[in-house]
Amino acid sequence: MKLDKQMIIAHRGASGLVEHENTIEAFEKAVEVGADSIECDVRKTKDGKIIVVHDEDYQGKLIKDLSYQDLSILTTANGFLMPTLEEAILWCKDKIVIDIELKEEGYEEEVIALVKKHLSCKDFLIRSFNDSSLKKIKRIDKNIKTVLLLGVEYPKWGLFTRLSELFPLLRVLKTKCDMVSPHYRLVRFGYVKRLKLWRKPVLVWTVNDSKLMEKMLIDKKVAGIITNFPDVAIRVLKENKKSIA
């Protein structure tokens, strides 16, 4: 993935433009509107399938306690399918960069094996809130591009965690991550400038308001944003280029 321009990353596909996020339909819409990359989440089912899904449960049942067949029956009844990670990879191949978020620890090797079976390292990223997952990925293959996610909803260590997100140098060094992806509320106190000094591109999540997109992309000049509305973000960039011209 070359960061030779600001990246518009479709959050769970173009999730704001379709009925069901993290589906092939959402991925198709992301490509249709011109997104540079697709972010998706993965979890593991009871029978060992790695699937594309954000929440830890579906209709009150934990993903880890359901087989993929069980899940497929439930989701089909609601008019969609949760793709496997391999299906998502194959769909994205030769179309768009896939940005995979590990929602849990413990199956990093399986994810890497699946991705590298079909893609070269330039065609995917792996992101996580878990420092240990990122460290493990780099031990397996230092050429894989990793993204340190920052801005957990419920910080495990309270204020200490928040400070480590606002001033993440130690975590950046420990994980050897290639990029940093903070929640937009963390982007303050010269955040982007500090990360640029450490040569770490900043990919901000989840930016859905056009004014906030403009602030991040134009004013703060971040390397990219993750958004449910990639079409709006692309328009913001184009309108800025026109005004400069």
Mark where each language-model region is:
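Phosphate-group recognition and catalysis centered on beta-loop-alpha active-site segments
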Residues: 1-245
